[in-house]
Amino acid sequence: MNTIERNYEQAKEKYATIGVDTDVVLEKMQNIKISMHCWQGDDVKGFLTPDGELTGGIMATGNFPGAARTPEELRQDLEKAYSLIPGKHKLNLHAIYLDTEEAVDLNEIEPKHFEKWVEWAKKEEIGLDFNPTFFSHPMMKDGFTLA
């Protein structure tokens, strides 16, 4: 038995003392989809302007050790995370996480800028939710977006 399995068995015993059958819970979780935010992998930096400042009320720092620096690194990190989370899930993909060599701004983004994400999601059998990005951008002023 490896460390993860030993730790699970200990947790299973503790939950059993309060009437929770963790095996049943894990079984039920197989049918519940969650949509993980893409920024879990890099603390909201994204790839549109990765050296830009986080503004607009964002409380993240964008500088944690091991943060994904490229879309490919983020996809690898997500694959690992999804392999550890029971069930099949979705990714909530923000606009600033586009994957393109083309220099574009928020008001110029097109579906083609996310083709690699779509290909990856199909291969991994993961759904995609799109989330527009309305912060940390010069066009976001006084609570208005793309003004």
Spans of features found by a protein language model:
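Alpha/beta catalytic barrel-like cores
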Residues: 1-147
